[in-house]
Amino acid sequence: MRTDIRKDLEPTSGDLVMAGVKGLASTVPFVAELLDVVFSSPLEKRKEEWLIQLADGLEKLRKQVGEQKLENLADNEEFQTIVLDATNIAMRTHQEAKRKALCNACINTAKEIDISEDKKLVFVRLIDQLTDMDLKLLLYFENPLKRFEEKGETINTSGFGMGGLTTGIYRYYPELKGQDEFVANRIKNLYSLGLMNTESINTVMTLNGIYEPRLTDLGVEFISFIKENA
């Protein structure tokens, strides 16, 4: 399906010209500093990593569905738009969860996931608004008990116990302990976006309630679009 994209990312004549411009500008500290920010090698590295991540995802998909299923992607305008939007966002973030979500959005578009084009466009741009923590919380609340099972841990919800949503959150993400105010802020934001059906982390509930899925139908669609699907 593709040659090794790493070879295509070797420096071009344009890259060499830019290097020359930066060399000339080095005698003017302010200009040199500005160019370092805009055209720095970390940004090039970020671009290369994103393109390789996307190419590897498409190659994995090709092996799953076959060459013929993907041969029309180059003419698929919806796919092109999603990839362009995702690429623009990927260049502005270093957060791995966001870049993975963007890549999955592209791959799921190529797989013709059953979500309307308008929703796909909204969902990709929504990734740009959300934080790494937001995405983690959404993935957890899609199905808390399943998330624990994936970690090899079984939660017994038949016993007696009470608590709030943070009981499960902090058990699954212990690194979030002590961040009650920020976690509450992010959940409230996800609720305002229509992705979660619960606004407060302070409501006391049973064990069943603590580990219930908490996404709205829109939230479920969003997660299905941005996660890796078999």
What are these regions (language model features)?
Residues L9, L16, G20, F39, ...:
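Non-transmembrane, amphipathic alpha-helical segments
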Residues P42-D85:
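Amphipathic, membrane-active segments
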Residues V17, V21-L24, V31, L35, ...:
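Short runs of predominantly hydrophobic/aromatic residues within well-ordered alpha helices
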Residues S41, L61-Q64, Q68-E71, I89, ...:
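Surface-exposed polar/charged interaction patches
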Residues K100-A230:
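Long, helix-rich, hydrophobic modules that act as membrane-proximal anchors or helical bundle/coiled-coil regulators
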Residues L24, G57, Q64, A105, ...:
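Residues that form generic nucleotide/phosphate-binding pockets
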Residues Q80-K111:
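N-terminal leader segment of winged-helix/HTH proteins
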Residues R2-L58:
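Membrane-inserting effector segments that mediate pore formation, membrane fusion
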